[in-house]
């Protein structure tokens, strides 16, 4: 993947724009729970209607800026990733024109088609998702923990424990998924190769009455691919309930122990709401970040396959 990074150089300005608006988006996302806590503690509890209205208007402004920043990040990220894919495809096409027959045969027509289409698309999608979901994750996590710590040091431990359990679950599941993603790319190549052979040799197949045999051959490759894809989806299906269980246990713990601290006069009600929001936000962005990182090994395998073409020295 590192060898393809130089294709991002023409988009340095767009990358800076994305970083600026991503920072604004994360700041707004984290500031809203703080305003919610202030409304409850200083407005609802004290019955101060003016404070509620003023803070509510501030929340609307912050929400508007956050939404606008999110839209701009999405739009600029889409332009960046699509331009990145276009440049790689152009480089692969130019390189393919210089390859000898032997070089082309070594790669294979089916594999060349896959690398020029779906592989590059996957690389572009991984760049898009990285910008959208991974970039905000460390900012949200660090800032969220800092804000939670500023509210209550003891309650922050619950969020840290929830994060640890989630990361442990994601690590164990991710090890299995990385292997399956690599297998799936190889099986897609096989399926494309068999399909191309059937399409290009359709006259010969019909002449020798081999249609049934070729159908069975294609079915075997399709079933092989589908079994791997189903295995991946089964693992994702197991991961999400585990994540939701960990998150809900964290929320229940915050409400339970927070309620005890409120009754003892060590915390205000609004702070419980803020801590719950911080926990949800941190876990949400961690979940999205882990999903992308599980996707990246597949994109890395695609990048290696594209680099094989770009690194060939023509005979």
Q: Which functions belong to the PLM regions below?
A:
Residues 25, 29, 62, 66-70, ...:
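Alpha-helical transmembrane segments of multipass membrane proteins
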Residues 10-13, 76, 98-102, 118-127, ...:
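An intracellular "coupling" helix at the cytosolic face of ABC transporter transmembrane type-1 domains
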Residues 38, 42, 149, 175, ...:
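Transmembrane helix-loop junction
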Residues 20, 28, 32, 57, ...:
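Hydrophobic alpha-helical transmembrane segments of ABC transporter permease domains
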Residues 9, 15-72, 76, 149-154, ...:
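Transmembrane helix-loop-helix hairpins at lipid-water interfaces of multipass membrane proteins
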Residues 1-12, 111-112, 116:
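A short amphipathic helical element positioned immediately N-terminal to and/or at the very start
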């Amino acid at each position: 993947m590192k060898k393809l990074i130089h294709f991002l150089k023409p988009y340095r300005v767009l990358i800076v724009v994305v970083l600026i608006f991503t920072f604004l988006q994360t700041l707004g996302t984290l500031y809203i729970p703080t305003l919610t806590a202030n409304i409850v503690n200083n407005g609802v509890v004290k019955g101060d209607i003016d404070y509620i209205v003023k803070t509510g208007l501030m929340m609307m402004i912050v929400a508007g800026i956050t939404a606008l920043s999110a839209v701009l990040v999405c739009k600029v990220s889409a332009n960046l990733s699509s331009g990145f894919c276009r440049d790689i495809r152009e480089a692969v096409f130019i390189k393919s024109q210089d390859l000898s027959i032997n070089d082309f045969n070594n790669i294979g027509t089916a594999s060349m088609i896959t690398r020029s289409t779906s592989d590059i698309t996957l690389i572009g999608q991984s760049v898009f998702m990285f910008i959208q979901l991974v970039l905000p994750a460390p900012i949200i996590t660090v800032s969220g923990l800092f804000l939670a710590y500023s509210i209550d040091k003891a309650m922050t431990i619950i969020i840290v424990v929830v994060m640890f359990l989630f990361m442990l679950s994601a690590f164990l599941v991710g090890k299995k998924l990385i292997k399956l993603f690599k297998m799936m790319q190889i099986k897609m190549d096989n399926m494309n190769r068999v399909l191309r052979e059937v399409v290009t040799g359709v006259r010969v197949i019909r002449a020798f009455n081999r249609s049934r045999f070729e159908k069975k051959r294609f079915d075997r490759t399709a079933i092989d691919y589908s079994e791997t894809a189903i295995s991946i989806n089964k693992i994702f299906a197991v991961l999400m309930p585990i994540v939701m269980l960990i998150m809900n246990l964290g929320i229940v713990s915050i409400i339970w122990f927070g309620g005890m601290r409120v009754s003892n006069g060590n915390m205000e009600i609004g702070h419980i709401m803020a801590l719950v929001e911080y926990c949800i936000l941190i876990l949400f962005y961690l979940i999205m970040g882990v999903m992308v990182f599980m996707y990246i090994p597949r994109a890395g395998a695609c990048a290696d396959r594209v680099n094989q073409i770009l690194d060939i020295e023509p005979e």
